[in-house]
Amino acid sequence: MKRRKPILSLIFLLILCVVLQSAAFADGSLLSNADFSLPELPDGWDTVAYEAENYSVYTQNGALVIASAAENDVRVCQMVQVEPNTVYRLSAEISAEGVHGGRGVCLSVDNYTLDGAYAVSAGRTGSFDWTRETLIVRTGAKQSYINFALRLGSYSETSAGTARFRAAELVQTNDPEEIASAVSLDEPAQPAVKTVNESDEARAIRLRSYLHLFIICTIVLACVLLWGFYRNRERFYSLSADPKTVKRCFILLVLTGAALRLVLTLLFGGHDYDITCWQAWGRDIVQNGASQFYTAPGHEWYDYPPGYMLVLAAVTWLLDLFRIPSGSAAAVFAYMLPAYAADVGIAILLMRFARKRGFSESACLYLGGLAVFNPAAVILSGAWGQIDSILTLLLLLGFSELFEGRRISAGAIYGLAIMTKWQALIYGPVLAAEYLLSIRKKEDALRTAGGVAAALLVIFAVSLPFRGDQGFFWIVGRFFNSAGGYDYASVEAYNFLALCGGNWKSAELSLAPGIPYKAFGMVMIVLAVVLSVAMQVVSRRREGGETLRARPERLLIPAAFCMFMIFTFGHYMHERYVFPVMALLAFAYAATRDNRLLVSSMLLSVVLALNETTAMYVVSNAASAAVRGTQQHQIVTGVCSLFEVLTFFYTAKVCLERGFGQKDRR
């Protein structure tokens, strides 16, 4: 009998374990510890947040609570083993108090750091009592794990408020309707960057080492490329080439540039946030029309003006026409192509401008190649997928019309630039000054008024399809909402405020005792505008009656200086806002043949290429949690910001000398 007691005890324990296990998975759920009745977060659940402050995660009355005072993307995740090519139902009861902005309370599969797959439920905002939220997914052919997340907000759809979750389940389903509606996880947006067994510490170390690698590669490649261009410029200029040869060579440059960007697209797949937005926004407009785009629930955070949304819709429509699957490499490259087309357009404009200024055919080809292979442009339209080159092209087209005295068409193009990116408004004071200073007779005043009317008409026409049931001036409110959407001193822009520790810091914090970042930024923005307009006034008086066509640098240099100074010392700056300045400086060089302006453009290209590379990496889904805010990130930010500030001071010296002093320096 004594021998049987241990055996009976062991059998009893085994039975107890089976009973408990059965109770835990009585409903077939694959989640473990989904009962949030304990005062602490159960084992197996991990918390991840985009913003590291102003949120809390806790359990209360058998529910998981996620509360965030500021808009954030907070998720509580559990890694679950699943079967490949199988349909699963993810569900949970949710309730909310005062949830606003972005996606709201939702469920998701967040496999970005595993295999690139991602799916999210519809989500809900506002205040509501318990209701069930469901997400149906089909695992990929090679997927064995999914990262299930209870979530407040989502990627690029941050939310604030209090969200509650209970009765979370992850079960396999054979329901025909659910199988038909399942979201496929078999199209990863990014290659795998993490193994299941990799520790968080090892992953963080690896991702930080990638940051170092990207920085070194960017610096070396950008410097070698630009040094090669600059050192051999005289050799290019001295070559004799007829227009037909130059045309053939330029076509070869364009094809080579496209191939280079295709390689970068295949390697990087675009910036995960932005490419996801491009595809989702284009799909939304194609399927639901433009009228509800800005007003549908959860769309309050959409901060881009409507102009480029029409381009995204056109790209999506073409992809559907040719049956190219969304998320494929071909689709991602298609969303990259408009920006590269703008790069080519900038090169053509620069070549035409230089030809009019007396440059040889070979010299024009040199400048065109410099635009096509500009490191910052290559990264932006090849690796990232952003559209600042489109804004730059529109600004240059408007400037070119103004050079020829065509004020009305210049105004219309400027209106289109505003509808493409809000940052076009930064150039408004300099353009307004040029319009007003060039009024000499009644006809000039009428054409100036016509230019303003043309800009407003284009803004109204482009925004009209998106108005829906909003007022006629809805676009003004959308601009002000977007302007305050990133209340930071610097948003990964390596400038003076970032050098002073303001990167991703609230603009309300103090740069110095009694001086908030925002107040300092406003003063410097006003100073930049005043200096730029003064430069225009002085240069016009000095040059007498010469037209803008004869002296285009009278607009190009103040515009470049104004934006560069605002970027360096202003608040709310993103890393890409200074992009058009590179082209403006290159055009100013073609207008004056002042080599210092070409050097400034090249230096800024290196600075911006470095800023883009690190920003694209630091803000990516895969690396942000492991890299952003670390000591390595702070060191990189400090060094790069110092480089940017020094580049600005060199450029400012050249611009101020030309604007207030020298008339000619070849």
Report each predicted region and the residues it spans:
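Aromatic/glycine/proline-enriched transmembrane-helix motif characteristic
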Residues: 18, 218, 233-243, 347, ...
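Extracellular and organelle-lumenal recognition/adhesion modules and their flexible linkers in secreted
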Residues: 25-213, 512-515
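Start-transfer (signal-anchor) and selected internal transmembrane alpha helices
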Residues: 2-17, 25, 203-263, 355, ...
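Membrane-interface transmembrane helices that cradle and orient dolichyl/undecaprenyl
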Residues: 356-361, 396-409, 439, 545, ...
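Perimembrane helix-loop-helix junctions
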Residues: 2, 427-457, 467-469, 580
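Transmembrane helical bundles and short interhelical boundary loops of multi-pass, membrane-embedded
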Residues: 27, 187-219, 227, 249, ...
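Extracytosolic helix-loop segments that constitute the early lumenal/periplasmic catalytic or substrate-binding loops
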Residues: 276-303, 307, 317-324, 469-478
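Specific aromatic-rich, kink-prone transmembrane helix
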Residues: 348-352, 390-407, 584-585
